[in-house]
Swiss-Prot record:
Species this protein is from: Protopolybia exigua (Neotropical social wasp)
Basic residues bias locations: 1-11
Keywords of this entry: G-protein coupled receptor impairing toxin, Mast cell degranulation, Secreted, Toxin
Main location: secreted
Similarity section: Belongs to the bradykinin-related peptide family.
Region feature Disordered, mapped onto this chain: 1-21
Record-given protein name: Protopolybiakinin-1
Distribution of this protein across tissues and organs: Expressed by the venom gland.
GO molecular function: toxin activity
Disulfide bonds: none
Length: 21
């Protein structure tokens, strides 16, 4: 879906953490 795009929060992505907005 277009609403489910992996975005980088604060420009950094913690290991094993995938932010889906």
């Amino acid at each position: 879906d277009k609403n489910k795009k992996p975005i980088r929060v604060g420009g950094r992505r913690p290991p094993g953490f995938t932010p889906f907005r």
